[in-house]
Regions:
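PLP-dependent class I/II
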Residues: 2-4, 8, 12-14, 19, ...
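A glycine-/small-polar-enriched, mobile loop at the entrance of the PLP active site in fold-type I
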Residues: 37-40, 55-73
Length: 397
């Protein structure tokens, strides 16, 4: 008998983690799989950050931390927001968590009531709608296709807002598309939101430092909506620290207090040693961040070039993050042997089993006509993966 809670039965498993698990199973059987499904940098954490963590261990810095994180880390985040983003916050407006994923979930759980609507632009990160459902809210999906560079318009946002709307989740740079909102585009959205002060913005900026066409722009910069914006960020992507699990929110103090209250009952403060590592990330040299960004840009250029050479792919040109999100519906209805391709998930599984390349079908991202490829891997892997994909797709008739 299934005695799980209704809220858990409503949740869908993570498609990205499922594909990664399937890829690892094939690897364990001796199959040479190139994994383009993973959403994390392939670089190592910079040395000065690791040294800070080692020192913390040697100094026995291993006690419970305050729920929102140590003041020294929160002050480092305040300085980062001022120096890099031109935004003014205090330490009381910062709450650190076990990764940006928890920060997003904390914020949704603190804001959303049963029946509240949360606008989620599609394509979206797979966990956004599930987190809204976990909070007994209703995800309202706005779809922006490749013809819009996967970015919603002010007109679309205006139509989606109702008296039940509580929040908008906005991810820029985007996972899964790599699209980046410009200052002008954000200003257009802010103008709409200013007319609806009951709507909060959860601004996921975890890929902030991985951009290829200029400075990152935050929607929190617009005074007319600043007090309704909750920034989510962290060290995972920019500093290659996915396993250290430090994220944060920056927002109105009353929301931060609510998040602290929630987190105090769930997980308490984040890992003390990881906080020292994150402090070193924010206060130390930023040279490794730029070096990784340049490598990602080179890989972006490479994978876009190779993907455009594959007949049947419609390819976007991502301006940030480390994902390509080609449209692949021209292959739907085709087959190779007993393998039929009806949707992007079928195509992703076909590429894994026949081409031995792991990608993620777009259905769980709200875009069933696309697949996501991560180029957080070596140039050699990208070249070989795209060769395999091209050969496997050529077999479909």
């Amino acid at each position: 008998m299934n005695q799980l809670s209704d809220r858990l039965n409503r949740l869908s498993p993570s498609a990205t983690l499922a594909m990664s698990q399937k890829s690892n199973e094939l690897k364990a059987q001796g199959v040479d799989v190139i994994n383009l499904s993973v959403g994390e940098p392939d670089f190592n954490t910079p040395d000065h950050i690791k040294e800070a963590a080692k020192k913390a261990v040697d100094d026995n810095f291993s006690r419970y931390s305050p729920v929102p994180g140590y003041p020294v880390l929160r002050n480092a985040i305040v300085a980062k927001l001022k120096n890099e983003n031109g935004l003014d916050y205090t330490a009381a407006q910062i709450s650190c968590a076990n990764g940006a994923k928890q920060s997003v979930c904390n914020t949704i759980m603190a804001l959303v009531n049963n029946g509240d609507e949360v606008i989620v632009p599609a394509p979206y990160w797979v966990s956004y709608p599930e987190m809204v459902k976990l909070a007994d809210g209703t995800p309202v999906i706005i779809t922006a296709g490749i013809d819009q560079d996967f970015k919603i318009t002010p007109a679309q946002l205006e139509v989606a807002i109702t008296p039940k709307t509580k929040a908008l989740i906005l991810c820029s740079p985007s996972n899964p598309t790599g699209s980046v909102y410009t200052k002008e585009e954000l200003a257009g959205l802010a103008a709409v939101l200013a007319k609806h002060p009951q709507v909060y913005v959860i601004a996921d900026e975890i890929y902030e430092h991985i951009t290829y066409s200029g400075k990152h722009e935050s929607i929190a910069q617009f005074p007319e909506i600043h007090d309704n914006v909750i920034i989510v960020n962290g060290v995972s992507k920019a500093y290659a620290m996915t396993g250290w699990r430090i994220g944060f929110i920056a927002g109105p103090e009353w929301i931060v207090k609510a998040v602290n209250k929630l987190q105090g009952q769930y997980t308490s403060g984040p890992c003390s040693v990881s906080q020292k590592a994150a402090e070193a990330a924010y206060t130390g040299t930023q040279t490794p961040v730029e070096e990784m960004r340049q490598a990602f840009q080179r890989r972006r250029d490479l994978i876009v070039k190779l993907a455009k050479e594959i007949p049947g792919f419609e390819v976007n040109n991502p301006q940030g993050a480390f994902y390509l999100f080609p449209k692949c519906d021209s292959f739907f209805g085709k087959s190779a042997g007993d393998r039929n391709i009806n949707n992007a998930d079928d195509l992703a599984m076909y590429l894994l089993e026949v081409g031995h390349v792991a990608c993620v079908g777009g259905t769980s991202f709200g875009s069933p006509e696309c697949i996501r490829m991560s180029y957080a891997t070596s140039d050699e892997n990208i070249i070989e993966a795209m060769r395999r994909i091209k050969e496997a797709l050529a077999l479909l008739k």
